[in-house]
Amino acid sequence: MKLKKRICAFTAAAMMLGAVPVFNETEFVSDIVITAEAAKLSSPSGIKASVSGNKTTISWKKVSGADGYRVYKYDAAKKAFVRLKTVSGTKTTVSGLSKGKHYFKIAAVDKVNGKYQAGTASSKITVTIKSASSKTAEKKTETTTAPSVSEKANGSSLSIAKAMGNGWNLGNTMESVASWLGAGALPTDYERAWGQPITSEDMIRAVKNSGFDSVRIPVAWSNMMSSDGKYTISEKYFERVDEIVGYVLENDMYCIINIHWDGGWWSDFGSSDEKVRAEAMKRYKAMWTQIAEHYADYSEKLIFESANEELGSATKGSSSMAESYERVNSINQTFVDLVRSTGGRNKNRPLLIAGYDTDIAKTSDKRFKMPTDSAKGKLLVSVHYYSASTFCIADNENNSWGYRDSWGTQSDIDAMKKDFEKLKRFTDAGYGVVIGEYGVAHKKSGSSYTAKKGTDLFFKNVVELSEKYGFCPMLWDCSDWLSRKTCRFTESYLDGIF
C-alpha cells in the first residue's frame, strides 16, 4: 500500500546450559577462506562468547577504521563459512541454535563506494549448545491454560502472532521502485528514492523503544536483479537488506520480509498468454529460492511473507473469480513448498500467507485456502486494514471516490469490530493473524498535511481489538507517525496507544 507516498504501507532466553567456547582450537571442520578481504582492516580481537539456552552472544573489541562487522557461520552442507549478518556494533546475538557445536567468524568491514569490503576474519569461534530448551517456553507451559482444540491442531501459530505484539512498517524504503536511477544506482539510492532517509540502527532502536515488537520490511528485489531470465538478485541489495534485518533482530523484535509491489510484474500471473504466466512463476520461484537460501540460517524471528496486496485482483487478469482464487492458493502453496525445501531453519520458519488482495472480506471467503505445510503451527495469514478507504486512503476533499476527514462514531467502531470478527475463521482454525498494514492518510491542504480528526481513535481501536483477538497489527509508516529524523512520535497521543 502506498497512501500517496506519505502514509507509509520477536523465544530464546534460557537456562545457562552452554559451555565456554573454545578459540584457536584444532580445526575439525573445513575452514574455508573468506573472500574479499580489505587488508587494511585487522582481525577482531578480544572475542568473548556466552551461551544461554539456544542462543549465543559474541562480542569483540572495536577495530580501527571499521564501518561495521560481518558475522559468518559455518554451513556444513556448503562446507564453508557463509555470511550470517552485518552489524554496526561490537556485539551480536544469534538465537534458535540447535543442540551441538556451531562455528562462527567475525570480520571488520569498511564501506567503499557503497559496497562493504571485509578485512581478515577472526579465528574460528566454537559455541556448544547443550540444550535447545528455553525458560520462556517452560514458563508459558506453567502459567498458561491448556490450548484449545484449534490451537493444538495448528501448534504455535496463534502464540506467534501474540508474541509479535504491535508492529511497524518501514514504509517507502526498501520497496521503493525508481527506474530513473539507472544501472549504476546503489541500494541506498533506492532506499531514499521515495523520500525516506537511510535506515539506521538508531531508528530501529527507536521503533523498539516506542513500544513496537515487530517490524515489516517491504522489499522490491527487482530493483537490482539480472535481466537475463535467471532473475539473480544483486549481492549488494542482499547486503543492505541484511543490515536492516540485523538491526531488527539485534533489538529482539520479529522481522518480516516479502516481495512487495516490485514494479508491478505480478500482473503477468493473470496474462492470457500461458508463456507469460509461466515466466511469472519462474520469476517468483527464482526470487524466493534465493531469498530462502540466503536467510536459511537466520533466527526464526525472521518471517517470510508470500506477497503483498497484489496477490488477487492484480494477478486475476480476465480469469473468473473462482480461477483467480485457485491461482492465489496455488502461488501461496508454491511459496510454502519452496521455502520448506531449502532446509536449515526454513524447515520450521514461520511463514506469513498473503490473503486475497490482503482484504479481510475477500480473504475470509471460503474460496481462499491456507496452504498445506510440512511444519506444524507455522503458518499465519496476512490482511491489511484501510477501512473506510475514504478516511484511511483519501487525502483531500476533491478525491473522486469520496473523502472523510473524521472517524469515531459508534457506527464506525461497530463496522471495525464486524470486520475483525470475520478473521475468527482463521483463529478458530488455529492460524495466527497479522494485520500487515493499517493506517490513516493525512489531510492535504495546499502543500501542508495535518492528521485527521479521529486518527487517534482509529489507531486505538485497531490496537485494542487486535489485542482482544490475538492479532498482530502493523502500522504503515513513512515518518508520518514515528519521525526517522527525530526518532520520536509526531503526535503526543501515540505514546498512549503504543
Question: What is each residue range found by the language model?
Answer:
Residues 194-214, 230-261, 268-306, 328-340:
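An active-site-proximal structural segment forming one wall of the substrate-binding cleft
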Residues 94-116:
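Beta-strand-rich modules
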Residues 38-65, 114-132:
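Pro/Thr/Ser/Gly-rich low-complexity, intrinsically disordered linker/stalk tracts
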Residues 19-40:
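Sec-dependent signal peptide cleavage junction
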Residues 83-89:
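Short beta-strand segments within Ig-like beta-sandwich modules, predominantly Fibronectin type-III
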Residues 278, 282-412, 418-441, 468-469:
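Active-site region of glycoside hydrolase catalytic domains
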Residues 138-214:
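N-terminal carbohydrate-binding accessory modules
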Residues 410-495:
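Substrate-binding cleft of secreted/luminal carbohydrate-active enzymes
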